[in-house]
Each structure stands twice: as structure tokens, then as C-alpha cells.
Swiss-Prot record:
This protein's name: Ribosomal RNA small subunit methyltransferase A
Chain sites annotated for binding S-adenosyl-L-methionine: H11, L13, G38, E59, D84, N109
Enzyme class: transferase
Listed EC numbers: 2.1.1.182
Amino acid sequence: MPQPRKRFAQHWLRSETALEQIIQAANLKKSDRLLEIGPGTGILTRRLLPLVQSLIAVELDWDLCKKLVKSLGDEDNFLLLQGDILKLDIATEAQQFPKFLPINKVVANIPYNITSPILDKLLGRISSPKQPSYDLIVLLIQKEVAQRIIAYPGSKNYGALSIKMQYLADCNYICDVPKKSFYPPPKVDSAVITFRPRSLLNSATNPKYLETLINLGFSSRRKMLRNNLQSLIDRDLLTEFLTEIDLNEQVRAENLDLNQWIALSNYFSQ
């Protein structure tokens, strides 16, 4: 097994249980065309290849790419791209290999330090969702981030990230993956989480306004919502709206669920 490199935040997943849970979460079919981000040593890649039509793997580390080519290069449904997933245009890079496109599912064990930009790359933002979207995304990420993504209103983990991700996708927490499942063990635990991108045709009428509201609403968690939003919405008008949807005028941002945020945005963006 190659030695993990700190500069790439590499931690090799070695738990058979975790690998199997990732594969089960992906609900694979023989017609699936996968994108795997950061295949590393190929431990998951080898299990995925027999189950799908094709797999494009993107790996930044040149040395790992050489090892992957040596071990998996003869697989006719495997395409390896060397580069930074945040900078690569997969469709352009793989256009001469039509059987690998379009990608319909993503599986990734991603470095913790690029979780946010990876989510932007795969799902987009409220104001600019990724189109066309994937059918399913399976990520192994930091447990704390996964808990924030699936958090419910009023809980300590509920925040802007929760609302944004739940707006863009149906998010499902699959399982915990303890730090001992990796070599070397990271400092924190991980979790497997899935995203099924939503159809957004009947959501916010002004997504950019909704995104602005959410960011402002959570800019000071201890303040009441009407104080955080006063630069956009008159306090009295907001109080009137909150009363109409059976919320106290002293509510904070974390008390509103996704549908209430959408209703708030649609009402005041007219």
C-alpha cells in the first residue's frame, strides 16, 4: 500500500464494512455510468467496476495514477483522468469516450478540506443549481458536516448549510464510519451520506433572493430573524408574515423549516 501524503489529505479507507455500505448506498445497476472522485489505491474502484457500465475516476496524485493504470488499465470500462476535480471539465475531458457519458451517479471519499467546493461542483447552489443533475451522489465526508447537512429545524446543527443542501437534494444519512476505518486514522469520524438532486421547477420563484435571505438570516444566530433581515424586509411586515404562518415574531433563523424559508422568499420577492 502506498504511503499517504499529507499535502493531499490522503487517508486510505480499509474497512470492508464501510466499503460495502458505500456500494449498497449507490444502488448500482449495470447501466450506471459512474464518476469516482479520488480513487486513491483503487480499493473501492475494483469493487465498483464489475457492477456498472463504466467508471471515470479523477485522481490528483500522479504517483497514484501510475499505480492505477498498472492495476486497472486493462479494464475496458475504466477511464482515469489525472487532475483537480474542482478544475476539470469532465464532459470535455471524456468527450472522445462516449460510452462513459453522461455520468448519472457519483461516488467519492473526499478530502475534508475541499468538502464545500465539492458540494458546489456536484450540486451547485440555490441560485445556480447544477444542470443536468446526477441521479444519485454518494459521499464519504466528515461526520460533523454530514450531521449539519441532514439537521432539522431547532437542532444545534441546523443552519444555512442544512437548508441549502436540503433545497437542492433529498439528503440521507447512511452510516457512521469511525476514524479507525482509515490509514492513517484522521482526527475526526466520517459518515456516508447520499444526495438525490431535486426537481426545482416548483420551488423558490427567486432563488437568488432566497439564497440572500438564508445567508442574512444566519449571519448572527443569536439574533431574532427580524433583526437579521431588517436590511431587506421591513420589521413590521416580517412580523405580520410570521404571524400568518403561525410563528412567533421573536423566532430565529434556525426555527424555520425549508418550506417556510421558501414561503418567506416567495412572499417578499414579488
